[in-house]
């Protein structure tokens, strides 16, 4: 942008740079690129490609995953671990319920044929990432626990459909909790004499949809050509990592293409870094793109 400002070339197209504030913000609404888009300040960019510079490895990233954060809260009955037949062990219930949910998820949302076209490294996944319980003695079966995790969803499935389906899984498991696998001869999730049943509830935090870039657009073609010229090869890829906001921009009519010049191997590392040589190539790629858009 500095070079363009200094030389002031006569261009057929307008080059606009947006420096994003709080790109991964989730706690403060109304700032950053979402607010800029809402106020219509990006509307002119609908007439040309929009390049989102936030991926890595100098290659076009043509697909990203949606994300559904979930929490599974499990209730049982607290009791001494020496008398497990008088308890409902929420840890065992959580493990078996989650296993059942995962089995159903992978049956209902299998690898999609378009994932091969886009080169996704993984299909959609549903897995735990955190486990917590209130605490207590080692000889105490707790009354409750919670498992948290996420769904990473390729953009060929609908976020709303998945949330609805996960809730249906949980409702069905609760209704038929006696049919769930147990852990050993005295493990159980119902205490008929006490009229007690274990139970699970699922809740969701804010979900985001994934993106499949338009592979027929001019923006994609000029990016690929520029990458091949500068880097020496072009190999688009897709991951189920999530990029915020770009699906919203795509739905509003923008030709969103994503690329980046950091290193995927250092994503979220303690000492995350990039290479100046890669950034220089990024400069050359976009100089080539600007030239191509003049044709």
Labelled PLM ranges:
Residues 1-65, 294:
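Acidic/histidine-rich catalytic neighborhood of metal-dependent amide-processing enzymes
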